[in-house]
Amino acid sequence: MLARQPLDFYPTPGLLTWALLDSHRFVPWRNQATVLEPCNGEGAISDVLKESGLFRLVDTADIDPAKTKPATAIGATSFTMDATDPGAWARSARYDWVITNPPYNQAPAILPLAFGNCRVGMAMLLRLSYLEPCANRASWLAEHPPAKLIVFNPRPQFRADTGGTDSVTTAWFIWHRFGNSQGTELEFCTNWRNHGTND
């Protein structure tokens, strides 16, 4: 069995973020939305968000100070933050959207905090098995079902030390801050390798 990476660091293939942007309309539209990427790592997701030009502001944060890099856009910030710490969220500015690939073993702690501190919604890249009603998330998921799932087929590869694809199915889970009266929309993304311009 392969060992877990330190801090659960598995960079997100850029094409998965392009697929998210192609599949979901983020409001406010027309370059007005603000975004926080709170588990930024080396910027795999935030670099695509910035390149897309769809957002007015993309701020980044990470628990590892070594992964915090200078902001490149006027008005943007990059800071050190433990996304499992309620106090860190309380000190942070509020954003329209939180978009990230959280460390899987910390996701149950991060998701409620991110959801409570976004204005419009959040998009989280998670294993599809996150839907299972485990003790550490069952109640929260029952009260906050996702508005949309974008499931990737074939499975993407997150580890450079494995051949082919990974052994777990992943999906973008999208929540809207003010309820979801239409149920959960399910989209199978079978052409994700054709999205965007990044590898």
Show the residue positions of the predicted features.
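Class I S-adenosyl-L-methionine-dependent methyltransferase catalytic core
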Residues: 1-199
